[in-house]
């Protein structure tokens, strides 16, 4: 045990520093730290020493071993850095070369319709509002004058969610975007409640909606746009004028025929289905509409004796299908690039 451990460490450091590749470094490692290496042999010989000497010599040898391992790791890192620098130098990028053009994508046809509808109504002063897709039963149905026994509230038509909100109200996936009209109107009323007269409420609410339905013309998830205009002097004539003008702009034609067919919706009174003529005497439903029911106006925080207005709701997929002559709603959700490229 008279071996100079400082000299062993110095020899190892010199040996490691002299190698130029990992294979040579592993050979030098074996000479000092391998099964028959210098330091390994010294550790094996500790068993021949008396306990007191074994303890002190073991500490010295382990310290030397730690220093050798540190030198080994330093050299490994240096070789790795040198290899990386060599690769970077060999693969240097000429930053003066022109870059690759970013491939242009395109909007989905339904999103094109979404933006087109928002632009058309925005041009005549309508705000665009967005709201939660998980709604309360009260906001989705009760606030809109849907009675408790209305079939739309059944689990056969509506996706209900386990749990309740902080006010212990049932939660569901909204079946239309009309709840956002109520939310927007209530915020509008709160904002201007200090005034004697609430400014007109003009808003559309496009978004995803959900119903338990799936076939060639229905999907469990679909897009709707709901519109609302409430003031103190809005009539059914305003509804006819606004929506007919929208259809002319959307279909880019002044030569369109529109009819308002009496119907029933719990949230409007009177109510009407809006149909549009599409050749050969065919009339196709475009939208539901009507004068906002007094109960709904009241739930918006307004006095129905002072304020009146109209509302409408249109399916964005349906508008898209009619504009482009698409017969199967499911094509929008299959992700077939051959289909989608036609609208790029």
UniProtKB/Swiss-Prot annotation:
GO CC, one annotated term: cytoplasm
InterPro entries named among the record's database cross-references: aa-tRNA-synth_II (IPR006195), aa-tRNA-synth_II/BPL/LPL (IPR045864), Phe-tRNA-synth_IIc_asu (IPR004529), Phe-tRNA_ligase_II_N (IPR004188), Phe_tRNA_ligase_alpha1_bac (IPR022911), Phenylalanyl-tRNA_Synthase (IPR002319), tRNA-bd_arm (IPR010978)
Residues binding Mg(2+): 269
Any one GO molecular-function label of the UniProt entry: phenylalanine-tRNA ligase activity
CDD domains: PheRS_alpha_core
Subcellular location: Cytoplasm
Keywords: Aminoacyl-tRNA synthetase, ATP-binding, Cytoplasm, Ligase, Magnesium, Metal-binding, Nucleotide-binding, Protein biosynthesis
Major place of residence: cytoplasm
GO biological process, one term: phenylalanyl-tRNA aminoacylation
EC number of the protein: 6.1.1.20
Catalytic reactions of this protein: tRNA(Phe) + L-phenylalanine + ATP = L-phenylalanyl-tRNA(Phe) + AMP + diphosphate + H(+)
Cofactor: Mg(2+)
Cofactor binding mode and count: Binds 2 magnesium ions per tetramer.
Presence of the UniProt keyword Ligase in the record: yes
Subunit-structure text: Tetramer of two alpha and two beta subunits.
Family statement: Belongs to the class-II aminoacyl-tRNA synthetase family. Phe-tRNA synthetase alpha subunit type 1 subfamily.
Protein name: Phenylalanine--tRNA ligase alpha subunit
Native species: Ralstonia nicotianae (strain ATCC BAA-1114 / GMI1000) (Ralstonia solanacearum)
Gene expressing this chain: pheS
């Amino acid at each position: 045990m008279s071996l100079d451990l400082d000299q062993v460490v110095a020899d190892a450091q010199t040996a490691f520093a002299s190698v130029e590749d990992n294979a040579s470094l592993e050979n030098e490692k074996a000479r000092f730290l391998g099964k028959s290496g210098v330091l390994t042999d010294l550790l094996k010989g500790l068993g021949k020493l008396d306990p007191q000497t074994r303890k002190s010599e073991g500490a010295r040898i382990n310290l030397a071993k730690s220093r050798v391992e540190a030198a080994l790791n330093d050299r490994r890192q240096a070789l790795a850095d040198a290899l990386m620098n060599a690769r970077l130098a060999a693969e240097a990028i000429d930053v003066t070369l022109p870059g690759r053009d970013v491939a242009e994508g395109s909007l989905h046809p339904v999103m094109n319709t979404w933006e087109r509808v928002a632009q058309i109504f925005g041009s005549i002063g309508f705000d665009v509002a967005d709201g939660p897709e998980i709604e309360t039963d009260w906001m989705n149905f009760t606030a809109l004058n849907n009675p408790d026994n209305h079939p739309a509230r059944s689990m056969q038509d509506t996706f209900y969610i386990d749990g309740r909100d902080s006010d212990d109200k049932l939660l569901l996936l909204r079946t239309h975007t009309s709840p956002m009209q109520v939310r927007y109107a209530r915020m509008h009323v709160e904002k201007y409640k200090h005034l004697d007269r609430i400014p007109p409420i003009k808003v559309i609410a496009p978004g995803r909606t959900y119903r338990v339905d799936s076939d060639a013309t229905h999907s469990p998830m679909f897009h709707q746009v709901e519109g609302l205009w409430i003031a103190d002097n809005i009539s059914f004539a305003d509804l006819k004028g606004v929506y007919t003008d929208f259809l002319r702009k959307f279909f880019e034609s002044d030569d369109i025929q529109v009819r308002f067919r009496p119907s029933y919706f719990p949230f409007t009174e009177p109510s009407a289905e809006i149909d549009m003529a599409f050749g050969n005497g065919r009339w196709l439903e475009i939208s539901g509409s009507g004068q906002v029911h007094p109960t709904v106006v009241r739930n918006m925080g307004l006095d129905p004796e002072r304020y009146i207005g109209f509302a409408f709701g249109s399916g964005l997929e349906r508008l898209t299908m009619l504009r482009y002559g698409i017969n199967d709603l499911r094509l929008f959700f299959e992700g077939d690039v051959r289909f989608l490229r036609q609208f790029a």
